[in-house]
Amino acid sequence: MQNITDSWFVQGMIKATSDAWLKGWDERNGGNLTLRLDEADIAPFATNFHEKPRYIALSQPMPLLANTPFIVTGSGKFFRNVQLDPAANLGVVKIDSDGAGYHILWGLTHDAVPTSELPAHFLSHCERIKATHGKDRVIMHCHATNLIALTYVLENNTALITRKLWEGSTECLVVFPDGVGILPWMVPGTDEIGQATAQEMQKHSLVLWPFHGVFGSGPTLDETFGLIDTAEKSAEVLVKIYSMGGMKQTITREELVALGKRFGVTPLASAVALY
């Protein structure tokens, strides 16, 4: 009998959550992670499923996600503990046929429930499915230290944050040419912040929540982790630059355009045109 804890998706979630904890992005129960699966991924592990899966209604219907399985982190769970007890800290859920709710097929033991940011995740999954023609499968939220710090000292608008992050490290324009969306501060764990995040996810694979954290989307766990890691590295460089008195020189607009041409990407126009 195959054990679901040995599956690629449970092992992938263990690695991603452990790596994020080691990075310092997910203190206590901070952060959440969801991965969209296919029926073929979970079918071999049906014998591991709960005999009577709990059903939880969604706060709003998600018909685009009907019959779709996900693996998710749990509410109030610590990323550092996922590797110690995956079944207590992770769950495989499946949206019902009309998108009105989901069953917890595996994990989330002792009456645990999925992350409180599930509305933001599911709404963002819907938008990224449309934006990437189904390619993106992962939504990751974490408290990346230096990205948060920048939201206190830079004007919180997409063009400026994007441009500064591109300047902080040459690879950034190549990794996220679509730029970084940013919201006003909002109460977390609500449909409102979920809807606002999803709206930005129509245009950007990275979305900042000021004074709180970042949302990232990608086709795989590695790609999504790497996306956030790249932006966070640039933010760290910028924090050091500003602490040393600011930039004396930087990558120019012409150089950013040349970089985009070399790697075949189209940089966010508003960030390129900023200055």
Swiss-Prot record:
Compartment list: Cytoplasm
Chain positions recorded as Zn(2+) binding sites: 141, 143, 212
Any one GO BP annotation for this protein: rhamnose catabolic process
Transmembrane segments: none
One GO CC term, this protein: cytosol
Record has Zinc as a keyword: yes
Active-site residues per Swiss-Prot or TrEMBL entry: 117
Keyword Transcription regulation annotated: no
Domain of life the protein comes from: Bacteria
Major localisation: cytoplasm
An MF annotation (GO) of this entry: metal ion binding
Reactions that this protein is recorded to catalyse: L-rhamnulose 1-phosphate = (S)-lactaldehyde + dihydroxyacetone phosphate
Cofactors, names only: Zn(2+)
Note describing how the cofactor binds: Binds 1 zinc ion per subunit.
Function, in words: Catalyzes the reversible cleavage of L-rhamnulose-1-phosphate to dihydroxyacetone phosphate (DHAP) and L-lactaldehyde.
The protein's assembly and partners: Homotetramer.
The name this protein goes by in its record: Rhamnulose-1-phosphate aldolase
